[in-house]
């Protein structure tokens, strides 16, 4: 195998002794990752962009010269986007209540994930990012804290905040701030799922308006996927939670679930997930491990599309789904074909929003991201095992950024 120095630099292995690298190759990914984290002692760092080697350098970068930039911003706060790095800075903000499949592990324990996200922002979007882990579960306190710091940022990425609090936090911040705010667990997952579905439907020759879609999981991701697909033209959607099919009029539902209950399950089907799956064309799982049986897949329509996205263990093993007759399968894991991962979304999405000088990220920009991702797989390349570009395909991130920028300009969300 050719040794890729650039790849080693990206993941930090150039800091590790060759003997340690060899030892890592015998471990599983969790062991490898833990060992690497011990060696790295952090995945991001801050570096200066200007020289400070002489008295003149110091006088220009800092005192006394810097005061002139301060006065310019004092007279016009918008100039903070021109005279500082604010314009290109996007924090990854969490309270640590819904981290990966680990749940409520606390803000400090979520820090490795947030650092990793910051690495991806820089690597694929050239966006300066850092973690902000808030030690509070109080919705109002979190909103207030973020608003107090917002003058330092060009955008905000919310991450791993539990449902339903995440809905109010994002909605309020979008209403009260004039920079892009994006909850990736909701919309990033929805965007990449739609991209995968756009290309999968080409292969099975079906229209989104004609198919029956079942979503298992009524948290942040499931509800966002549901609303996003409905907006894109889906007509027949059923969403399930742990108790079964969500139906309008159920008083036990939270506010967000009640909203989607009015938009879905038009035939008023009652029962469990197995009942919902009968005759379905598409299954999308954002729930928990092993919640789908072989029999459920067998009960689906011909040429079924199955996206079990739960991590690290999917709703059904892809091999089992294939045996049961699933025609196209996509998971959240890199171990299988068709990884449906929101890494394809957020770097390019924010790059496009920032480059357009957008004050928000609207639905049209998110749809543009989905269609941009889908377009990166050519007609000749498209197959049952290749419906999405790889997350590390830099051309895909550039395409997303350009598509989002054009949508922002077209829909008039540019700051005056």
Question: What role is predicted for each listed range?
Answer:
Residues 131, 157-160, 181-184, 215, ...:
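General beta-strand structural signal in soluble alpha/beta enzymes
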Residues 24-181, 407-414:
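N-terminal ligand-binding/catalytic initiation module
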Residues 100, 105-125, 187, 191-284, ...:
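Glycine-rich phosphate/diphosphate-binding loop of Rossmann-like nucleotide-binding domains
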Residues 258-328, 334-335:
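Rossmann-like adenosine-cofactor binding region
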Residues 13-26:
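Short, Lys/Arg-enriched N-terminal segments with co-localized hydrophobic residues
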Residues 184-185, 308-416:
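Adenosine-phosphate binding glycine-rich loop
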Residues 38, 81-86, 122-123, 148-150, ...:
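Solvent-exposed alpha-helices and their adjacent loops that cap or buttress functional pockets
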